[in-house]
Amino acid sequence: MFATLVDEIQSLDDHGVTARLRELELERRRGDAETLALITLATSRGVHRSDGHLSVAGWLRANLNWSGAQVAAAKKAARLVDSHESVGDALVDGHIGASQVGELARSARNPRCGSEIGEVLDLLLDHAEQLPYDDFRRVVRRWESLADEDGAALDADASETNRTVSAHEVDGGLDLR
């Protein structure tokens, strides 16, 4: 089968190879968008239960033979496109790819600043479309650091504030917890 496929594309000239590659990438992006839409629909309907699974994650692993990492990434991306339709539109239209959606989804799940991503999403989508992926990733990470300037310090302060200690005498010694 693969040999037949290779034989079919051998006749393409250099321009044809590039054109076909771009065509396939657009198809992949549309397919990724539809997959995320199906995951969202399946989640809201509880399709996994009718298929005998306890969770959407189990349903995805069983039906698609996905790894745990793939399942987690897809669920994050599905939540993002469900709550921010413009991301799904950009993906289905082929303006951005799965990597850009994944980076936005990761950022949207940041517990300290992810809820603010909607305020800058249009700008981030422009960057996702225009910049090479590594540059786009730096832009998103920079936005996170600016939106969460005190985040790490606040976590450290909360940890310190919430610390407790108790001392108990045990067998003539002191047990600190």
Predicted regions and their residues:
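Conserved C-terminal region and hinge/linker of Rieske [2Fe-2S] proteins, especially
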Residues: M1-R177
